[in-house]
Amino acid sequence: MQNLPKWKIVLSIICTVFAIICALPNFIQINWKFLPHDSVNLGLDLRGGANLLLDVDFDTYLNDSMENIADTLRKNFREHKIGYKNLLVRHNNIQLEVRSTEVLKSLKKIIHKIDPEIIIEVNKNKIKLRYSESRLNDLLNKVVEQSIEIVRMRIDSTGTKEPILQRQGNKHILLQVPGVDNPSYLKNILGKTAKLTFHLVDENANIEEAIKGHIPLDSMLIKGDSEHHGEYYIVIKKKVLLSGTHLTKASASFDQNSQPMVAFSFNNLGSKIFTEITKNNTGKRLAIVLDNKLLSAPMINGAIIGGDGIITGNFTIESANELALLLRVGSLPTPLKIIEERSIGPNLGADSIESGKKAGLIGFTAVCIFMILSYGVIGLFANIALILALLYILALLSLFQATLTLPGIAGIILTMGMAVDANVLIYERIKEELHKGVSNLYAIRTGFESAFATIIDSNLTTLIVAFALYIFGVGAIKGFAVALTIGIISSMFSAIIITKLLIDIWVKYFKPEKLGLL
């Protein structure tokens, strides 16, 4: 008498019930808190949405870094009374001339104190400062990783579900956001660096002369926008008194005149700096600048204690909310340029889903008919195992919130054939044993045992390929790899455990004289 392994029965029941619970939200809405309620996430090609390829402007980042170093050098040279001239930033290098080569030793010490990784090239009294290639690569990787993280936080703050965000090539970022109805808003929040800085207004500068290009060395000309006066210019000090890196909160609100504004709060350090700035500069104007554009320049009437402030300007409710979002998340290390944009409509996604359903249904039906015609009753068991494998796949995709793409559907359809292939291999081995004249029980046990190693080997090699596709692939390729991996694991379980259990139950309780394989 064939004894049914209890662990197989328990495992099969638990897995099947759990799979039904996880897959159920794809068909009906469940509001019970103790049950899973997430359905499968549909990718861009199935749901529609926006596909953006972003270019990280590393040259701007490098140039800004060199400008900051150059400003620090000027300050240090004045403090140490080192004579120099023609200190300029060109082609991401710093160039200068010293009046005497005797100061080179002191100069090198100052430079390495600012940044020990700067390479110093000396040609008589001319000096060139630059970064090595390895240092540039490290900086590029850092900037790209920071940009990806900031973009992810900005997208997540909009409530968008399951954005696909990954590095592509050297300095490109691929962003796919399914289900986006307003790509222009998406581009708007990505197109801003959101670098917030506070400067004193240069009250002594002549605006007309500054517009002509005659600007004091320690000042700069920036543009503002007023609801009443339109565009205008103002001269501010270059020195950044405080930056947005110290912000902890930012939210859209309304002022006493019911006009939109942005309220913000600083952390402890930022609050102390803000208090000192307002205390020491009473009667002066403080310029609030975002991405080199003036937001406002209010008069400082006295020390502001507590670290809270407001930004007023020509805001709408939408622009105030947008600015608050950008300030909360933080600034990008460098601007991002959209170099490629594609939008996929929801109708096209619906057509893709319908095509995938038809292909899957045709493939499933053909496989089921083939198995029944070829193997009779145990072919039916293979079909039942196949249905359960599809259930497990759907459950795992829902449980792990994996994104299903059109290539992912292709991967699932492919695993349907692979699942049946394992059963075919097992059944052919059983048939070989039956031809030797052995009993049904012995043929079944030997057939499964002899086919087991072959099934594991073939599926393992496919899994290795799927892992490689996931690691090195992008976008749809990753979706295919995920679906293929989940499909292989599910099909192996159904072929080895479920099919064997169904055949054992049939043989034990129905005691067929023949298995229908001869």
UniProtKB/Swiss-Prot annotation:
Location(s) in or outside the cell: Cell inner membrane
GO molecular function per UniProt: protein-transporting ATPase activity
Name of the protein described by the UniProt record: Protein translocase subunit SecD
The keyword Repeat is annotated on this UniProt entry: no
NCBIfam families assigned to the protein according to its UniProt record, in alphabetical order: 2A0604s01 (TIGR00916), secD (TIGR01129)
Membrane topology category: Multi-pass membrane protein
Parts of the chain that traverse the membrane: 9-29, 356-376, 377-397, 406-426, 451-473, 486-506
GO cellular component, one term: plasma membrane
Matching Gene3D superfamilies: 3.30.1360.200, 3.30.70.3400, Multidrug efflux transporter AcrB transmembrane domain (1.20.1640.10)
HAMAP family from the UniProt entry: SecD_B (MF_01463_B)
Native species: Rickettsia typhi (strain ATCC VR-144 / Wilmington)
Main location (coarse class): membrane
A biological-process GO annotation: protein transport by the Sec complex
PANTHER family in the cross-refs: PROTEIN TRANSLOCASE SUBUNIT SECD, PROTEIN-EXPORT MEMBRANE PROTEIN SEC
Alphabetical UniProt keywords: Cell inner membrane, Cell membrane, Membrane, Protein transport, Translocation, Transmembrane, Transmembrane helix, Transport
Gene assigned in the entry: secD
Keyword Transport found: yes
Role, per record: Part of the Sec protein translocase complex. Interacts with the SecYEG preprotein conducting channel. SecDF uses the proton motive force (PMF) to complete protein translocation after the ATP-dependent function of SecA.
